[in-house]
């Protein structure tokens, strides 16, 4: 699965063959087909498992700490670690959605919506803002985290991790208006 994820991330799902995956994984076609029915099944596994891991962590953290600053800190750290240490599954998911079966796509979207909602509720409490403002902050944080692991040309992983953590802390600790309406610049 990891070999397939690396290939899908580097070349795109449509440009990777089962033969490419087998060669990268060091297995034969028949061995691969004992575990997966098709290349599409491999794609589903590549994106589904990491999304479920993120969601299960978020659920367990919320269960233990509620929608609190502690929950948000743990969500941010886990998301940063997942993006830096993982296979790029969220990037692949975002780019290859049309290659997924519709039923599976709907399920994955529901999981992502729940994941975002847990973040949003924790940000609302931590930053003392309404849910709409918290949702904007959630997307700003997660999209920034999701995009920066690709920029490791001159920095090592730990340097990127430190920058991402500092960025998240700066955003969360900023003095945010309580509502979206309060966020508009004066005179608008």
What do these predicted regions represent?
Residues 44-50, 93:
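Alpha-helical DNA-contacting segments of helix-turn-helix folds
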Residues 81, 117-125, 151-188:
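C-terminal peripheral helix-coil segments that are non-catalytic and often amphipathic
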Residues 5-8, 54-55, 72-83, 91-93, ...:
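Short, structured motif recognition centered on aromatic/hydrophobic residues
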Residues 45, 59-85:
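Hydrophobic alpha-helical connector segments
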Residues 102-128, 135-139, 162:
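Amphipathic alpha-helical packing segments from all-alpha helical-bundle domains
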Residues 3-41, 45:
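Helix-turn-helix
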Residues 10-14, 65, 86:
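Short coil/turn segments at alpha/beta junctions that flank glycine-rich nucleotide-binding fingerprints
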Residues 83-103, 150:
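Amphipathic alpha-helical segments used for helix-helix packing
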């Amino acid at each position: 699965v990891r070999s397939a994820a690396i290939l899908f991330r580097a070349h795109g799902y449509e440009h990777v063959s089962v033969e490419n995956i087998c060669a990268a994984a060091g297995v034969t076609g028949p061995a691969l087909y004992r575990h997966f029915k098709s290349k599409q099944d491999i794609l589903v596994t590549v994106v589904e498992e990491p999304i479920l891991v993120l969601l299960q962590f978020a659920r367990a953290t919320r269960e233990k700490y509620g929608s609190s600053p502690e929950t948000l800190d743990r969500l941010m750290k886990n998301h940063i670690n997942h993006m830096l240490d993982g296979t790029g599954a969220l990037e692949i998911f975002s780019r290859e959605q049309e290659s997924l079966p519709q039923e599976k796509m709907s399920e994955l979207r529901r999981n992502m919506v729940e994941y975002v909602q847990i973040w949003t509720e924790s940000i609302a409490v931590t930053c003392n803002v309404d849910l709409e403002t918290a949702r904007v902050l959630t997307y700003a944080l997660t999209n920034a985290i999701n995009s920066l692991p690709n920029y490791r040309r001159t920095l090592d992983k730990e340097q990127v991790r430190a920058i991402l953590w500092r960025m998240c802390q700066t955003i969360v600790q900023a003095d945010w208006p309580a509502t979206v309406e309060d966020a508009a610049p004066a005179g608008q």
